[in-house]
Amino acid sequence: MATPAGRRASETERLLTPNPGYGTQVGTSPAPTTPTEEEDLRRRLKYFFMSPCDKFRAKGRKPCKLMLQVVKILVVTVQLILFGLSNQLVVTFREENTIAFRHLFLLGYSDGSDDTFAAYTQEQLYQAIFYAVDQYLILPEISLGRYAYVRGGGGPWANGSALALCQRYYHRGHVDPANDTFDIDPRVVTDCIQVDPPDRPPDIPSEDLDFLDGSASYKNLTLKFHKLINVTIHFQLKTINLQSLINNEIPDCYTFSILITFDNKAHSGRIPIRLETKTHIQECKHPSVSRHGDNSFRLLFDVVVILTCSLSFLLCARSLLRGFLLQNEFVVFMWRRRGREISLWERLEFVNGWYILLVTSDVLTISGTVMKIGIEAKNLASYDVCSILLGTSTLLVWVGVIRYLTFFHKYNILIATLRVALPSVMRFCCCVAVIYLGYCFCGWIVLGPYHVKFRSLSMVSECLFSLINGDDMFVTFAAMQAQQGHSSLVWLFSQLYLYSFISLFIYMVLSLFIALITGAYDTIKHPGGTGTEKSELQAYIEQCQDSPTSGKFRRGSGSACSLFCCCGRDSPEDHSLLVN
């Protein structure tokens, strides 16, 4: 019989010994593993990473998701083509009207002279201003297009008039270059003259129009050149785009907001002249087109696209969810049965990046299609936003086709090479970006005043990127050669700058970049080569030797993996290079 002291010592030892019953996992031994349970988990994991063809052989389930993606590619591409044809007509109509306005309202304008079109004398400036207003007043008689005035379209300074002629100048300004003195009050004053087109009776000659309704008041304009900032002419015109009849669509009504600017903020003796337009598209009030087609087919087709993408979204989202559930089951199983934690990278293997790509494309397609329906109903006019949404979604849909090519060894070279080379390429690009940005800032601050290609940071980046690809080398050097007489020091610096950049990036950076890609290709081109070691998850799955045609995958339908097409990965004996 044990003594009380012995019993107390035994109880103390038992309490101080780690035990699962006291809420701690330290020192716990994994629960015994049932061979059947573990084999069933391996089999479900292997099925989850099978290709659609292997899943069909394993359970006889048709790859419905694959067939749905093929249908989605067709309908999305057809939709994009139809919208592209319509959008092309809109952009063409807008650009051609802008060109027509420049020829109508800018005195002496010629195509391609936007950057050099300017006034250099006071007489030229007055003539250009009066010419633009005169052309506006007689526009219905001279233009080839059908335009209508917009009463009250002169902007906030028009006071309800159709056209506003405004000059902006400093409140007080006195400049005396002879004595190197100036006196400027930087407050800006805006003076405007309102002009309305006359309501011409039928029997009045056009040359007498200037004297009706006081429209000739703009002729009394007096510019304060010594303190002038700019002169602006703002008005609106309406027209109808009949080109849409080509695509069997109802024409749209357009309102062009036109702004002519005579810019003198530099006070350099040169006043650039530019014309800018903004377009507003709205539905015509009482459209009447004989024998025009019905747009119900386009609406029905858009609805089909939305339904197809919605179904694709649901199936892909369900597959992602089932992958997440299977991952949790695997993590819990490995901890309870083997006492091992699963790393983050192994968990991410359950996340199919291709499904995320397809889900993103579905969201963009649905958003773009809804916007397209609004545009065709004349409730929206965001053609550019709709184009970006539909174009990006179509790009992602077609890129998603590569996933199904990765199920074949010979078609998987591109994806496998990118997968192996991507980490090294990203690190390499980070180092190169530092040098590239340094050249951008240096070129902008030093060469910007002397070279048109270095006037802004974005232009510098575009110029240097073109030089890397071997484009416009001679033109870039020649433009700096013309500036040699202005500053020999800057010209010498430009030679060192350009030669060092071209030599560094073409002969070294590009060569190393290509070497990284080539090295990755050499790694994976050998049979069985993947460029990376197999993870513990892959090694665990490979212990399942059941082939898809063994019939064992048909047992137990309560699988946590997708019922249709999941992320494809061939069996290990095939030695295929599959990227998920």
Curated annotation (Swiss-Prot):
Placement of sequence motif Dileucine internalization motif: 573-578
Annotated spans, Required for palmitoylation and association with membranes: 565-567
Membrane-crossing segments per the record: 66-86, 299-321, 351-371, 383-405, 428-448, 492-513
Chain positions carrying an annotated carbohydrate: N220, N230
Region described as Extracellular/lumenal pore loop: spans on this chain: 107-121
Region described as Disordered: 1-38
Database matches in InterPro entries: MCLN_ECD (IPR049134), ML1_ELD (IPR047316), Mucolipin (IPR039031), PKD1_2_channel (IPR013122)
Residue numbers on the Cytoplasmic membrane side: 1-65, 322-350, 406-427, 514-580
Region of interest: Interaction with phosphoinositides: 42-62
Selectivity filter, short sequence motif: residues: 469-474
Residue span of motif Dileucine motif: 11-16
A cellular component term, taken from the record's GO annotations: nucleoplasm
Notes concerning its domains: The most N-terminal extracellular/lumenal domain (referred to as I-II linker or polycystin-mucolipin domain) contributes to a structure with a four-fold rotational symmetry in a tetrameric assembly; the structure contains a central highly electronegative pore with a 14 A diameter. The pore is critical for Ca(2+) and pH regulation. The protruding structure formed by the I-II linkers may contain all the interaction sites with lipids and proteins in the endolysosomal lumen.
Family membership noted in the UniProt record: Belongs to the transient receptor (TC 1.A.4) family. Polycystin subfamily. MCOLN1 sub-subfamily.
Identification of the protein by name: Mucolipin-1
Organism: Mus musculus
Gene behind the chain: Mcoln1
